[in-house]
């Protein structure tokens, strides 16, 4: 994606990224499966980190049809013979740990604000996932 320079600063604008008044950058994406509802991706120290979080979410939702801030980082998906979504995302973020991360390889997303329905949905998903894991272990 071409980055657009702001009118009054030398900062670049990225798709899905807004600068907060206190200097941090917020990333969000619209989910077409939920009638264009905003999905909060987190708050980041740099615009580039926020843009990469947007790219990961966009690629996860839309695949090769996604309009990305850093399409060259996902080029492997188009060129590679049998690349997968995970391989493309991992290669695109080599040396990059967006939003923090633990030693177990799972990404941690910092939520600045959640409305009650989204929070309840996330909590229900976590409970269902844990119950499924327990049921699988007992079989």
UniProtKB/Swiss-Prot annotation:
InterPro entries: AP2/ERF_dom, AP2/ERF_dom_sf, DNA-bd_dom_sf, ERF_plant
Compartments where found: Nucleus
Database matches in CDD domains: AP2
GO cellular component, one term: nucleus
Domain of life: Eukaryota
Annotated segments matching region Disordered: 77-103
Pfam family of the protein (one): AP2
GO function terms (MF aspect): DNA-binding transcription factor activity; transcription cis-regulatory region binding
Job of this protein: Probably acts as a transcriptional activator. Binds to the GCC-box pathogenesis-related promoter element. May be involved in the regulation of gene expression by stress factors and by components of stress signal transduction pathways.
Subunit structure: Interacts with MED25.
Family that this chain belongs to: Belongs to the AP2/ERF transcription factor family. ERF subfamily.
Protein name as it appears in the record: Ethylene-responsive transcription factor ERF095
Organism whose genome encodes this protein: Arabidopsis thaliana (Mouse-ear cress)
Origin organism lineage: Eukaryota, Viridiplantae, Streptophyta, Embryophyta, Tracheophyta
């Amino acid at each position: 994606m071409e980055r657009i320079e702001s009118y009054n600063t030398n900062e670049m604008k990225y798709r899905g990224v807004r600068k907060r008044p206190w200097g941090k950058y917020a990333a969000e994406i619209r989910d077409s499966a939920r009638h264009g509802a905003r999905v909060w991706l987190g708050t980041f120290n740099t615009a580039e980190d926020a843009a990469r979080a947007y790219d990961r979410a966009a690629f996860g939702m839309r695949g090769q049809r996604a309009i990305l801030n850093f399409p060259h980082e996902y080029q492997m998906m188009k060129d590679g013979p049998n690349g997968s979504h995970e391989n493309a995302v991992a290669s695109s973020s080599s040396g990059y740990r967006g939003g923090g991360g633990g030693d177990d390889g799972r990404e941690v997303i910092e939520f600045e604000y959640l409305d009650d329905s989204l929070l309840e949905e996330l909590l229900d998903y976590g409970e269902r996932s844990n119950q499924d894991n327990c049921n699988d272990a007992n079989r």
